[in-house]
């Protein structure tokens, strides 16, 4: 099970304090935290091409946890890692991005997505 715990705007020095783990299949290929060519900082899922957690120097942050629901599994679903990179690389605010995502969420298997930008979470 993936876990994510955070504190937002509660510390005088740090806007975001985050503790997270990625509980994925051990044989799923990944690359550790690094700066991508497009400027974001994140690990990379080498199978799906996306990420589960990342930030952009412009102040954007996104994190994803998956949840498995065998009764509603979609074998041909889109990779959930693109949800994080889509927000980080896009121009939409967190609220606008989630509103847009509402229209296509059925294309993905189960997930929880946290997005933030400077003052908006």
Regions inferred by a protein language model and the residue ranges of each:
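N-terminal nucleophile
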Residues: 1-121
């Amino acid at each position: 099970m993936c876990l994510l715990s955070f504190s937002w705007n509660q510390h005088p020095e740090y806007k975001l304090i985050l503790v997270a783990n990625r509980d994925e299949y051990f044989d799923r290929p990944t690359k550790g935290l690094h700066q991508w060519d497009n400027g974001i900082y994140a690990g990379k899922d080498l199978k799906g091409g996306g990420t589960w957690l990342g930030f952009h120097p412009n102040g954007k942050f996104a994190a994803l946890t998956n949840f498995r629901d065998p009764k509603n599994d979609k074998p041909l679903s889109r990779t959930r890692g693109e949800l994080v990179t889509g927000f980080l690389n896009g121009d939409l605010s967190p609220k606008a991005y989630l509103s847009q995502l509402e229209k296509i969420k059925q294309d993905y298997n189960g997930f929880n997505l946290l997005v933030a930008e400077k003052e908006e979470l």
